[in-house]
């Protein structure tokens, strides 16, 4: 590995680059039927995670009817997101210092236990606990699937498989409410969780049997205590409660408590103090930090994380609030509104796979960032033009444009991280990207909820004077035509349409802001070359 024609710093840099190249060459690359089984198992694991993000949405009315716990509605979703966000970054360190295969299998097992608790929950508290447990497992599944891809497939072929996994994530995210409605209407809401058990079992078996232990740089002479200390316990002690405080403030602010309430202010203050402590210890911690500064300083990592934060946030706003438009304005049932989302699903999946194949063919991923930003921004902007009379052709066409934009860009940041980082840093880089996507979705779905609720209340006061806005909020979108007096219905639908389209302004702004990440991305090729670490 010594370079005879160089010395000093240049020689050291070149030697490090060669070492990185050898890391990629000595990975246990998988081919043939074994690869097909592993990738299928990984896609199913991502299906589990993405489904659980949204499948409960259409089941909540039946759950609250059974448990008589209307006040717990917010916790059914937020308990899952809280533990995902709190544990996602720490999984990056765990995947770095412990065997990838076993960490992934443990994450799926935790998720399965949480799903079983949810399915068998005798009361609302048990359901919330089950959701939190499932969230812990979920925090390590999606990133783990991408890390296994990195260890199993050569870099130049990896984008196509990453695109397939991204497509599966998109399918499940949008199809979740549809499946939740179908299970709730025709079987039981409990099957929203029981369905995870056989799917997870298939994933566990496929990985357990067919995946060999990837060749990681693990120091097997280290004690478990020494490895645990490398997980940055001090940083984690600051990070986890900071994220919980932030998400609780956004969950409760403007709904359970007014924004100027002491509890909300205190949560934001505690978040600011704790996250400042976390940042301080990350800077001091160097390579031992949960988020090593040298990784975050790489242009492609910072730009890719920002891009995924904005595009992911825009996507989740549409996933949550577009079905409400179909229910409130078009009178669709929960199941039918999911079917009406199919144009977005199909375009997202097709473009996600196509963009992965394109990167594999041409080698460069940076140009597709611009395509994603443009299409997503145009699609989101067109969706904000909806009225109560919007035709079928428009709501289908606009969804296709938006879905195509999101599908093109959803997996690009993962590809970028794997292209610019040495293999031993891929786990942390991948988790940083996934964390930004998850956190963005959690934050801006809450922001969207506050924007929507406040505008709907004002809209009902103006468009349907004489009707109590709180009645409209309690009724829900699917029951408007049955529960709202006929003389108020047109005004309420106008108020709903106005509140939803203005909520989508947030998604449009986020999609437009993603251009910052696109412009900052380095032009690196994944084709026909050995991968060297990017300059910090």
Curated annotation (Swiss-Prot):
It is found in: Cell membrane. It comes from Arthroderma benhamiae (strain ATCC MYA-4681 / CBS 112371) (Trichophyton mentagrophytes). The chain crosses the membrane at residues 30-50, 80-100, 102-122, 133-153, 163-183, 191-211, 234-254, 264-284, 306-326, 342-362, 366-386, 400-420, 426-446, 503-523. It comes from the Eukaryota. The lineage of its organism: Eukaryota, Fungi, Dikarya, Ascomycota, Pezizomycotina. This is MFS-type efflux pump MFS1. MFS-type efflux pump involved in the modulation susceptibility to azoles, including fluconazole, itraconazole, miconazole and voriconazole. Also confers increased resistance chloramphenicol and thiamphenicol, suggesting that it acts as a pleiotropic drug transporter with a broad substrate spectrum. Finally, increases the tolerance to cycloheximide when expressed in S.cerevisiae, but not in dermatophyte species. Glycans are attached at residues 123, 221. It is a multi-pass membrane protein. Disruption phenotype: Leads to decreased tolerance to the azoles fluconazole, itraconazole, voriconaole, miconazole, as well as to the antibiotics chloramphenicol and thiamphenicol. One of its GO terms (cellular component) is plasma membrane. The gene is MFS1. PROSITE patterns: MFS. Belongs to the major facilitator superfamily. TCR/Tet family. SUPFAM superfamilies: MFS general substrate transporter. GO terms for molecular function: transmembrane transporter activity. Keywords: Cell membrane, Glycoprotein, Membrane, Transmembrane, Transmembrane helix, Transport.
């Amino acid at each position: 590995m010594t370079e005879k024609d160089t010395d000093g710093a240049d020689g050291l840099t070149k030697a490090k680059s060669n070492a990185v190249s050898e890391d990629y060459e000595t990975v246990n690359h998988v081919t043939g039927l074994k690869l097909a089984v592993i990738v299928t198992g990984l896609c199913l694991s991502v299906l589990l995670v993405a489904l659980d993000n949204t499948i409960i949405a259409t089941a909540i009315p039946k759950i609250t009817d059974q448990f008589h716990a209307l006040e717990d509605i917010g916790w059914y979703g937020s308990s899952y997101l809280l533990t995902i966000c709190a544990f996602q970054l720490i999984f990056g360190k765990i995947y770095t210092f412990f065997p990838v295969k076993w960490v992934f299998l443990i994450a799926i097992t935790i998720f399965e236990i949480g799903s079983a608790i949810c399915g068998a929950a005798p009361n609302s508290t048990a359901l919330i606990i089950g959701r939190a447990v499932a969230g812990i497992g979920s925090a390590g599944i999606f990133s783990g699937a991408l890390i296994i891809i990195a260890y199993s497939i050569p870099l130049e072929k990896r984008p196509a498989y990453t695109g397939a996994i991204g497509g599966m994530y998109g399918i499940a995210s949008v199809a979740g409410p549809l499946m939740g409605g179908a299970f709730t209407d025709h079987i039981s809401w409990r099957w929203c969780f029981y369905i995870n058990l056989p799917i997870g079992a298939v994933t566990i078996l496929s990985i357990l049997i067919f995946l060999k232990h990837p060749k990681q740089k693990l120091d097997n002479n280290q004690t478990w205590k020494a490895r645990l200390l490398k997980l940055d316990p001090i940083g984690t002690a600051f990070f986890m409660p900071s994220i919980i405080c932030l998400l609780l403030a956004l969950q409760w602010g403007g709904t359970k408590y007014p924004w100027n309430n002491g509890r909300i202010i205190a949560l934001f203050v505690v978040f600011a103090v704790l996250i400042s402590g976390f940042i301080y210890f990350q800077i001091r911690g160097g390579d031992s930090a949960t988020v090593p500064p040298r990784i975050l300083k790489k242009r492609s990592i910072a730009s890719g994380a920002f891009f995924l934060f904005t595009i992911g946030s825009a996507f989740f706003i549409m996933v949550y609030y577009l079905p409400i438009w179909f229910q409130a304005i078009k009178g669709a049932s929960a199941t039918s509104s999911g079917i009406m989302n199919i144009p977005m699903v199909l375009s997202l999946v097709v473009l996600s796979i196509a963009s992965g194949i394109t990167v594999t063919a041409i080698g460069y991923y940076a140009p597709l960032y611009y395509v994603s930003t443009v299409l997503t921004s145009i699609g989101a902007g067109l969706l904000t033009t909806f009225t109560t009379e919007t035709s079928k052709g428009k709501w289908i066409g606009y969804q296709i444009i938006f879905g195509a934009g999101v599908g093109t860009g959803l997996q690009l940041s993962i590809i970028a991280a794997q292209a610019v980082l040495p293999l031993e840093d891929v786990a942390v880089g991948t988790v940083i990207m996934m964390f930004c996507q998850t956190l963005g979705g959690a934050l801006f779905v809450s922001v969207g909820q506050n924007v929507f609720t406040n505008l709907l209340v004002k809209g009902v006061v103006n468009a349907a004077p004489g009707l109590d806005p709180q009645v409209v909020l309690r009724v829900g979108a699917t029951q408007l035509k049955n529960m709202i007096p006929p003389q108020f219905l047109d005004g309420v639908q106008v108020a709903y349409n106005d509140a939803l389209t203005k909520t989508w302004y947030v998604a449009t702004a986020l999609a437009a802001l993603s251009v910052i990440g696109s412009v900052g991305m380095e032009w690196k090729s994944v084709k026909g070359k050995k991968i060297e670490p990017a300059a910090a």
